[in-house]
Swiss-Prot record:
PROSITE patterns: RIBOSOMAL_L29. This is Large ribosomal subunit protein uL29. CDD domains: Ribosomal_L29_HIP (cd00427). InterPro entries: Ribosomal_protein_uL29, Ribosomal_uL29, Ribosomal_uL29_CS, Ribosomal_uL29_sf. GO terms for biological process: translation. Belongs to the universal ribosomal protein uL29 family. It comes from Exiguobacterium sp. (strain ATCC BAA-1283 / AT1b). The gene is rpmC. It comes from the Bacteria. GO terms for cellular component: cytosolic large ribosomal subunit. Keywords: Ribonucleoprotein, Ribosomal protein. One of its GO terms (molecular function) is structural constituent of ribosome. Transmembrane segments: none annotated.
Length: 67
């Protein structure tokens, strides 16, 4: 998900998405360990999405207005 899309979300929505992505990341890692993962690049995408959302949450916490 793009940062511009995430910036339009509320803080509660972002926290919810981070939770969903963490759960998905757990499942992807489990699939990787058992050899069932079809698209290993998805792990990277999910990790980056979590990082983007956490960055936006931190910016809001500090009162930084980027973008």
């Amino acid at each position: 998900m793009k940062a511009t899309d995430l910036r339009q979300s509320t803080t509660e929505e972002l926290n919810g998405k981070v939770g969903e992505w963490k759960e998905e990341l757990f499942n992807l890692r489990f699939q990787l360990a058992t050899g069932q993962l079809e698209n290993p690049a998805r792990i990277r995408e999910v990790r980056k999405s979590i990082a983007r959302a956490k960055t936006i949450l931190r910016e809001r916490e500090l009162g930084i207005n980027n973008g």
